[in-house]
Amino acid sequence: GEVPADSFQERAAPYWPWATREYVIMDGALPLNPLTLNPPFPCTRSGFFKVTFLVALKAGKDSGEFFDCWLNEHVPNVRNTMEAVGGFRYVVSHSLDPSSETYAGMAELYFPDPSGWDRYRDHIEPDGMKNFVDYDNTDVFYTGTEMVGIEAP
């Protein structure tokens, strides 16, 4: 680790660089919720719910076969499910050196709200990823974000 340069880095420690290749599978529009009791500008609001998977590879598994399964089998499965339940963004990142990294990859799924994630879990079909993923060492983060845009006068 490096010495933190600011308070954010201090609280986000430990930080480590991670070289990945990103695949933007779905890049839909962020849902905007217009204001109802006053004029829409100079302020707009939007929000979303995001699920992030830091995916660990099972010991002894070939990362090339894993990435092939992820892109050619799992991605279509997730994309179809995301489209069916109203998800609007799906991004996959693969480690450039999975043999020396804690995680082989990362997946980010974006929904307008947490109910989209609930519907996703009810609809996703199992696929070949189960043969590669070390679920005990995979981490999952759930985040809600609200953004307020204020137009300068």
Which residue ranges define each predicted feature?
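Macromolecular interaction modules
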Residues: 1-153
